[in-house]
């Protein structure tokens, strides 16, 4: 039996035409990496037009057509004009329509003017030989990483042992309970790590809206057309060529999206090769919620929740923690609904993906908060409180202690890997778009998103952390660990639910029941 929250969501969506076009994106479970077609997607698609590449020409792999076009343009010193607005689409079918935009794209993706011979003889300039060798080596390294980590993840280790005998939780984080009586709490100030592209679906909602099911959407929003452009332009990773940025990257949380689009290629390359910034990563970052706003909303909800209860009906510490996790899950669902790719799925597929990975997204959200902002020896709650880890450990039972210990180990690993916000966002999408979810109507889209995000993450890591040669693989290997912790947390939560310790009207439990159905 599906929980009420799902039936309401599906019923309303069907009443507006089945298609689940609403803001949204999320994560996924056991991460089985397939042998993605990196040869085709990364090595054999011309970055200018998408045609099959024929070899290295003027600085990078391109097709014969773009090679010849670039050579003729440079040798004949041609000057083109664009009759549109200098943003024509260049692909295999219409690459000849606008030579101006085609040539600009050649420069943007990295074809080098200085590689064209002025004497019109055959063959390029020998000084690019070492660069080609390095490029080949990088591509071979990419393939090796993909295959190695694919094998490692296919042979996933057994999930951590769940639910030991001692399931007591003595007084679980007493200081949170006392602090909640007098909220405001000591807020943790979030610095420039947070961007300001507010999700339209979650921005400015009063706390009362958090009581509503996140799946119940107004007829107005359901009737709205899909996001402009939909999935067009995202089908192949080749469409997301790395942008050229002068010097350091602008931080996406303090810069407009436009500021990330880069500078004219030739000018930027004057001082050497700039790093690359996969455009897909920028698009994923735009979906991120504003964390201070989420924090304020959850705090307001908890205040309202406690204030509405009588003196002897106040939630105990564990009840408060459940409410906190419950509201965090609401915000995660809102994030998913407002995210690229996810909103293109029908409602049934959205529900299957969310039911599969909701606990992993909660764990990943918690872990990343610790990596970025928690003080040593403390746990940072979504409400902004720093809680002493030793105090929690001393008051928790064996199972909760085991969970916390595994989570802290994961935090330490990710800190040592220097996990950043861009990588975190990629991991969220890899979890949400799980290849393990069965009976999806649009499995092709899920598979495509996995491939694109994997490729974008790999490019980002290799360009920005070249000294950490195994970072990409190490990041992917954390996904099974997140999965294992989340399954253990689900078992623990279910046990507490059976004992009547979890507050009623809880989205956590509804999702738990839906997953077990």
Curated annotation (Swiss-Prot):
Chain ranges of zinc fingers (NR C4-type): 46-66, 82-101
Chain segments carrying region Disordered: 182-211
GO biological process, one term: hormone-mediated signaling pathway
Free-text comment on this protein's domains from its UniProt entry: The C-terminal extension (CTE) loop competes with a DNA minor groove anchor of the nucleosome and releases entry-exit site DNA, thereby promoting opening of closed chromatin.
InterPro entries named among the record's database cross-references: NHR-like_dom_sf (IPR035500), NR5-like (IPR016355), Nucl_hrmn_rcpt_lig-bd (IPR000536), Nuclear_hrmn_rcpt (IPR001723), Znf_hrmn_rcpt (IPR001628), Znf_NHR/GATA (IPR013088)
Key words, A-Z: Chromosome, DNA-binding, Metal-binding, Nucleus, Receptor, Transcription, Transcription regulation, Zinc, Zinc-finger
Reported phenotype of the disruption mutant: Larvae lethality from 9 to 14 days post fertilization (dpf). Fishes show an open mouth and an enlarged Meckel's cartilage of the lower jaw, but no other craniofacial skeletal defects at 6 and 10 dpf. Impaired development of the exocrine pancreas and liver, while leaving the endocrine pancreas intact. In the developing liver, defects in hepatic progenitor outgrowth and differentiation are observed.
CDD domains: NR_DBD_Lrh-1_like, NR_LBD_Lrh-1
SUPFAM superfamilies the UniProt entry points to: Glucocorticoid receptor-like (DNA-binding domain), Nuclear receptor ligand-binding domain
Family: Belongs to the nuclear hormone receptor family. NR5 subfamily.
Binding site for Zn(2+) 2: 82, 88, 98, 101
Region (AF-2): 504-515
Location(s) in or outside the cell: Nucleus; Chromosome
Domain NR LBD: 276-515
Function noted in UniProt: Orphan nuclear receptor that binds DNA as a monomer to the 5'-TCAAGGCCA-3' sequence and controls expression of target genes: regulates key biological processes, such as cholesterol and bile acid synthesis pathways, as well as cartilage, liver and pancreas morphogenesis. Ligand-binding causes conformational change which causes recruitment of coactivators, promoting target gene activation. The specific ligand is unknown, but specific phospholipids, such as phosphatidylethanolamine, phosphatidylserine, dilauroyl phosphatidylcholine and diundecanoyl phosphatidylcholine can act as ligand in vitro.
Cellular-component GO terms for this entry: chromosome; RNA polymerase II transcription regulator complex
DNA-binding stretch(es), residue numbering of this chain: 43-118
Gene Ontology MF term list: DNA binding; DNA-binding transcription factor activity; nuclear receptor activity; RNA polymerase II cis-regulatory region sequence-specific DNA binding; zinc ion binding
Chain positions covered by the region annotation C-terminal extension (CTE): 112-127
Ranges annotated as biased composition (Basic residues): 186-199
Name assigned to this protein: Nuclear receptor subfamily 5 group A member 2
